[in-house]
């Protein structure tokens, strides 16, 4: 409503760091733009517009390799020069790239559906008093949301611990109305400390699998 100009790009250190972007006038909401100049990007999928696949890219921005580590380099750059990002996404007919999540984070639904926890987390993180979250798959196959609430804001607004628990449950119910049946969150678990992160501020998901 305030017409604030912004855009979203996509990149990684190995690509110096830009892979794609679009100016704010032509930016397609939800995407991260089109391939940057002198870069080529494609989706490894039988149907790149509809079925997510790994995002691969090549061009002037791509690194020559990891310093003195040929094995690691060969693990991400193939013989044709394509750098395998490890990210999953789709690309529309105009070349706009939409990221779905990391390939290593993808979960399988009860009927083999691909579930991208980052997409669910993005919705949950925008809900009332949610600071950050992780969606994991329990041993029974159901999805569980681990939530670190914004305790400071909640307490400042007069909420109690019980109120916060009720609000997180209300968020779960509201979220389930926005996602597909196979993406439904069965229950939530509240954490009282911020999730541990890497130096790049990515949550160390592997530390929280025991919550299943």
Q: What kind of feature is each model-predicted range?
A:
Residues 1-27, 131:
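Gly/Ser/Thr-rich phosphate-binding loop
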Residues 35, 47-50, 54-109, 126:
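Conserved ATP-binding/catalytic segment of the ANL
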Residues 41, 95, 124, 145, ...:
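Residue-level signal for inorganic ion chemistry
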Residues 41-43, 87-91, 135:
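A structural signal for short hydrophobic beta-strand segments in well-ordered beta-sheet cores
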Residues 51, 92, 98, 115, ...:
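Generic structural signal for well-ordered beta-strand positions
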Residues 88, 126-151, 176:
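C-terminal boundary motif of the adenylate-forming
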Residues 107, 132-134, 141, 172-212:
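Conserved C-terminal "lid"/linker of ANL adenylate-forming enzymes
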Residues 114, 127-132, 153-190:
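Conserved C-terminal helical docking segment of ANL/AMP-forming enzymes
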């Amino acid at each position: 409503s305030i017409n604030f100009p912004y855009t979203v790009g996509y990149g990684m250190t190995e690509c110096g760091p830009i892979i794609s972007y679009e100016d704010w006038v032509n930016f397609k909401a939800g995407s991260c733009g089109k391939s940057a100049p002198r870069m080529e990007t494609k989706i490894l999928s039988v149907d790149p517009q509809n079925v997510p696949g790994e995002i691969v890219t090549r061009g002037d921005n791509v690194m020559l390799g990891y310093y003195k580590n040929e094995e690691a380099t060969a693990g991400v750059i193939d013989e044709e020069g394509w750098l395998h990002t490890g990210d999953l996404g789709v690309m529309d007919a105009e070349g706009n790239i939409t990221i779905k999540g990391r390939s290593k984070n993808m979960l399988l639904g009860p009927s083999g559906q691909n579930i991208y926890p980052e997409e669910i987390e993005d919705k949950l993180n925008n809900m009332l008093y949610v600071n950050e979250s992780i969606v994991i798959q329990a041993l029974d196959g159901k999805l569980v949301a681990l939530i670190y609430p914004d305790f400071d804001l909640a307490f400042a607004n007069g909420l109690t611990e019980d109120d916060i628990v009720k609000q997180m449950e209300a968020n779960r119910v509201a979220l389930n109305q926005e996602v597909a049946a196979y993406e439904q969150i069965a229950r939530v678990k509240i954490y009282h400390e911020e999730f541990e992160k890497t130096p790049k501020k990515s949550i160390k998901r592997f530390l929280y699998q025991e919550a299943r």
